[in-house]
A protein has these predicted regions:
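S-adenosyl-L-methionine-dependent methyltransferase catalytic module, highlighting the catalytic core
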Residues: 12, 16, 83, 111-117, ...
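Solvent-exposed, charged interface segments at domain starts and junctions
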Residues: 1-10, 38, 151-157
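A short linear-motif detector with a strong N-terminal bias
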Residues: 17-21, 36-41, 61, 77-78, ...
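Polar low-complexity intrinsically disordered regions
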Residues: 1-2, 55, 203
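A structural signal for short coil/turn segments at secondary-structure junctions
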Residues: 33-34, 53, 161
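Class I SAM-dependent methyltransferase Rossmann-like catalytic core
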Residues: 1-33
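Conserved SAM-binding loop
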Residues: 28, 37-140, 152-155
Length: 209
């Protein structure tokens, strides 16, 4: 698998298209946020977007604390500030200028109540940066509850929870979705070939003993 990873690393923009495009979009949004703004990254995990918001007062929330090993692997990223249920984040009403919630709501049992909680802690006129897959395979099991969110879902439930000025963008097209699926299958096929080659080498080595 290491060989396959090294082979695909130069092609990351192709084989990780959705993530790369999403990260690029988030970086552009982060540049629009005024210096010193208070931001809460909900479901922050390993805090992969922390550096994008170095100009902000950046806080994090998740339902578990990072282990010491995870923190070390994240190049010194700090521990999670608020370890809590996403429906009961221990902060005051209207506490934050910006809420970041990326690739999270498909992993919570009650996404509509999650939006309501986000609305509670976001200041009037604040900004919500939210992303979620329209479709995806199972991942982070057993915490994968929903398969995807349409623009109609966002329009209905964000509007019902006091959000306005919605700007909903698709991350790619139907063609890029098929391409991403095909590239994933191709990559998995190469990984299987590498594993079989390694197994063959082991068999030959045993026969040679």
């Amino acid at each position: 698998k290491v060989i396959v990873f090294k082979f695909f690393k130069p092609l990351e923009k192709i084989f990780a298209y959705n993530r790369m495009r999403r990260d690029s979009w988030l970086a552009k949004q982060a540049d629009k946020i005024p210096d010193g703004s208070k931001i809460l990254d909900i479901g922050a995990g390993g805090c992969p977007h922390r550096e994008k918001f170095n100009h902000c007062e950046y806080h994090t929330q998740d339902f578990v604390q990072l282990s010491d090993a995870q923190i070390q692997n994240q190049e010194g990223y700090g521990k999670i500030d608020f370890v809590s249920d996403v429906l009961e984040i221990p902060v005051s009403d209207e506490s934050y200028d910006v809420i970041l919630c990326t690739e999270v709501i498909e992993h919570v049992p009650d996404p509509i109540s999650t939006i309501k909680e986000i609305s509670r802690i976001l200041k009037p006129g604040g900004t919500l940066l939210i992303t979620a897959p329209l479709q995806s395979g199972l991942h982070q099991e057993p915490y994968h509850f929903y398969g995807g969110y349409t623009k109609y879902w966002y329009k209905k439930f964000l509007t019902e929870n006091n959000f306005s000025d919605l700007n909903i963008e698709a991350n790619g097209t139907l063609h890029t979705t098929y391409f991403a699926l095909g590239s994933t299958i191709f990559k998995s096929f190469l990984e299987v070939l590498v594993e079989k080659k390694n197994l063959l080498h082991k068999i030959v080595a045993l026969i040679s003993l």
